[in-house]
């Protein structure tokens, strides 16, 4: 739309969840399979490795599009920044990057701001601290990215459950809408589905159907009978 020759690449992996202490992709793959019940994450980590390789011989300045209101894009930015050394970088900050359409994104072209040495050091130090903590989740708190435990979203999920049977997908959607209304996009349906399955297996919810499929599973709060 803007008739620009820029090449666009993205991180693929979602560093808002899973182990980050090392760059061993196999550790992340095994974690996603165990905690989230998703197989095939090796393809995601492979694409992220290709993404990083694109910067090895790069001479041109890079413009990074960042949203501090979206955990996945913010975490992905910090992870990327920790790997690219001192290449010149400019930043475009967009509040809701993942749902911004092409017409809206075009309005941000030309508004990039050079990343200062001080800000680069701050972001890199933040990621190093998150790596040391190596928590199961990263979430947004204000404008900061902080560590969180795997149960972080459980109370929100349970607040949308009722004593009537509901599709798992309906509870997940209600929780995502809650994020949307708050203007902070904390996580996606992959993690929320996995947490609902764990809550059901722990007896916090009753269930019927296929716990691994949001549209084939129904949940409700345990009855008092």
Identify the role of each PLM range.
Residues 5, 79-89:
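A short alpha->loop->secondary-structure connector
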Residues 36-77:
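Long, hydrophobic/aromatic-enriched structural stretches that serve as scaffold segments
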Residues 101-170, 174:
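A conserved mid-domain beta-alpha-beta active-site/ligand-binding segment of alpha/beta enzyme cores
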Residues 173-189:
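Short helix-coil junctions and helix-kink-helix linkers
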């Amino acid at each position: 739309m803007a008739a620009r020759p820029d090449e666009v690449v993205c991180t693929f992996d979602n560093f808002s969840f899973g182990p980050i202490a090392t760059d061993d992709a196999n550790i992340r793959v095994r974690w996603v399979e165990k905690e989230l019940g998703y197989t095939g994450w090796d393809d995601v980590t492979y694409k992220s490795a290709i993404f990083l390789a694109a910067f090895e011989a790069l001479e041109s300045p890079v413009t990074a599009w960042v949203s501090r209101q979206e955990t996945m894009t913010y975490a992905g930015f910090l992870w990327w920044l920790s790997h690219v050394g001192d290449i010149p970088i400019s930043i475009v900050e967009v509040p809701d990057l993942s749902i911004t359409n092409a017409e809206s994104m075009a309005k941000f072209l030309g508004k990039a701001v050079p990343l200062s040495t001080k800000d680069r050091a701050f972001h890199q130090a933040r990621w190093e601290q998150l790596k040391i903590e190596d928590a199961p989740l990263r979430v947004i708190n204000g404008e900061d990215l902080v560590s969180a435990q795997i149960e972080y979203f459980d109370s929100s999920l349970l607040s949308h459950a009722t004593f009537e049977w509901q599709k798992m997908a309906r509870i997940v959607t209600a929780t995502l809408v809650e994020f949307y209304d708050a203007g902070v996009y904390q996580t996606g349906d992959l993690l929320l589905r996995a947490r609902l399955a764990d809550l059901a297996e722990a007896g916090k919810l009753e269930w019927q159907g296929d716990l691994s499929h949001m549209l084939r599973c129904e949940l409700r709060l345990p009855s008092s009978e």
